[in-house]
Swiss-Prot record:
This is 2-oxoglutarate-dependent ethylene/succinate-forming enzyme. It comes from Pseudomonas savastanoi pv. glycinea. A dual-circuit mechanism has been proposed in P.syringae pv phaseolicola for the complete reaction, in which the binding of L-arginine and 2-oxoglutarate in a Schiff-base structure generates a common intermediate for the two reactions. Monomer. The gene is efe. Residues 166-286 form the Fe2OG dioxygenase domain.
C-alpha cells in the first residue's frame, strides 16, 4: 500500500469547524483503508530514532541478560522470540513491553492488582528513551481521540474521559531476518485496545487487512470469539510501505465495540524480511479501572472492563510466563471482580 492517507494533526484540538472536518476525514480513512498516517515533526522524529536506537542496543545484549528483564508482577519486560502465541502458533519477534511503571510502594501494587508493578528496565538510557517517546505518542493519542469524537458528532472528551491515567503501553519489537524455513513474524490478529500508533524502520513487513464489505469479524472481547488467525491466508492483505516522517494509526477492539462496528479493529500481521526489522507499537488505552460502553446504543448493558480485558488478553498470549503463573497462584484475578463491581456502580450511577 503506497497511497496511505496522511494527515497533519493540529497542536491543539478545540472543537472548531476545522477539527470536526478533520475528525470526519480520519473516520472515513479508517472505514476505507483500516489505517492512516500522521505526519511527525523533527522533535517527534528524533524521539522515534532514539527509541529505535535504544532497542537495537538492547537486542545486542546476551540472552541471559535480556531474559532477566522480567517480572512476576507486570507483563512489562522481555519476551523471547517464540514465546508469544497467536492462534496457537508461536510468533518470532523479540519484544520488550513497557506497561505503566509503578513502584512497589504504589497502593495498587501493594494491594496485589494483576499486571501492576515496576518495569524491569535494562538500563537508564533505555528507560529514558522509551518514556520520552511514549509521552510524545500519548500527546498524539489524546488529539486523535478528541478528533474521532468530533467526527462522530460526540462530545470532544467522549474517549479521553476514559484515558485519564490511561493504561498506555508499548511493544518494542525486533524481527529476525527470514530463513528458508521461517517467514512468519506475527500471525494475523487485531489489537485488544482503543488506539494503536506505530513506528517502523525502513525494512518493512507489516500487512493490514482493510474493511471488506459483508465480512464477519470476530469480536475479540467476547470469551467465545477470537480474531487471532482469522483470514491469515485470505486476500486482501495490503503491505504498509515504510515511509519516513510518519506514524501509522489504526483502531483496536475497544473502538470497534464502542462504535458498534462503525470503526472496525484492523487485522494485521507481520512477515519477516531479508533483514532484521525494528518497530514500536504504542497502545493509547483506557484507565485500568474504566469500563467502555456502546456509544450509539445507550440502552445496551454490555460493558468491557478494561483491566479485565487487558489481563485476559495477556494471559492468553503468555500462558507460561512468570506473570501469568503469579496471577493464578496468588489469585490476583479476584481483585478484578471487585474493580468491575465498582466500575459498574459508577457507570449506572447507583
Amino acid at each position: 500500500m503506497t497511497n496511505l492517507q496522511t494527515f497533519e494533526l493540529p497542536t491543539e484540538v478545540t472543537g472548531c469547524a476545522a477539527d470536526i472536518s478533520l475528525g470526519r476525514a480520519l473516520i472515513q480513512a479508517w472505514q476505507k483503508d483500516g489505517i492512516f498516517q500522521i505526519k511527525t515533526d523533527s522533535e517527534q522524529d528524533r524521539k522515534t530514532q532514539e527509541a529505535m536506537a535504544a532497542s537495537k542496543q538492547f537486542c545486542k545484549e546476551p540472552l541471559t541478560f535480556k531474559s532477566s528483564c522480567v517480572s512476576d508482577l507486570t507483563y512489562s519486560g522481555y519476551v523471547a522470540s517464540g514465546e508469544e502465541v497467536t492462534a496457537g502458533k508461536p510468533d518470532f519477534p523479540e519484544i520488550f513491553t513497557v506497561c505503566k511503571d509503578l513502584s512497589v510502594g504504589d497502593q495498587r501494587v501493594k494491594a496485589g492488582w494483576p499486571c501492576h508493578g515496576p518495569v524491569p528496565w535494562p538500563n537508564n538510557t533505555y528507560q529514558k528513551s522509551m518514556k520520552t517517546f511514549m509521552e510524545e505518542l500519548g500527546l498524539a493519542g489524546e488529539r486523535l481521540l478528541k478528533l474521532t469524537a468530533l467526527g462522530f458528532e460526540l462530545p470532544i472528551n467522549t474517549f479521553t474521559d476514559l484515558t485519564r491515567d490511561g493504561w498506555h503501553h508499548m511493544r518494542v519489537l525486533r524481527f529476525p531476518p527470514q530463513t528458508s524455513t521461517l517467514s512468519r513474524g506475527i500471525g494475523a490478529h487485531t489489537d485488544y485496545g482503543l488506539l494503536v500508533i506505530a513506528a517502523q524502520d525502513d525494512v518493512g513487513g507489516l500487512y493490514i487487512r482493510p474493511p471488506v464489505e459483508g465480512e464477519k469479524r470476530n469480536r475479540n472481547w467476547l470469551p467465545g470469539e477470537s480474531s487471532a488467525g482469522m483470514f491469515e491466508h485470505d486476500e486482501p492483505w495490503t503491505f504498509v510501505t515504510p515511509t519516513p516522517g510518519v506514524w501509522t494509526v489504526f483502531p483496536g477492539d475497544i473502538l470497534q465495540f464502542m462504535t458498534g462496528g462503525q470503526l472496525l479493529s484492523t487485522p494485521h500481521k507481520v512477515k519477516l524480511n531479508t533483514r532484521e526489522r525494528f518497530a514500536c507499537a504504542y497502545f493509547h488505552e483506557p484507565n485500568f479501572e474504566a469500563s467502555a460502553y456502546p456509544l450509539f446504543e445507550p440502552s445496551a448493558n454490555e460493558r468491557i472492563h478494561y483491566g479485565e480485558h487487558f489481563t485476559n488478553m495477556f494471559m492468553r498470549c503468555y500462558p507460561d510466563r512468570i506473570t501469568t503463573q503469579s496471577i493464578n497462584k496468588e489469585n490476583r484475578l479476584a481483585h478484578l471482580e471487585d474493580l468491575k463491581k465498582y466500575s459498574d456502580t459508577r457507570a449506572t450511577g447507583s
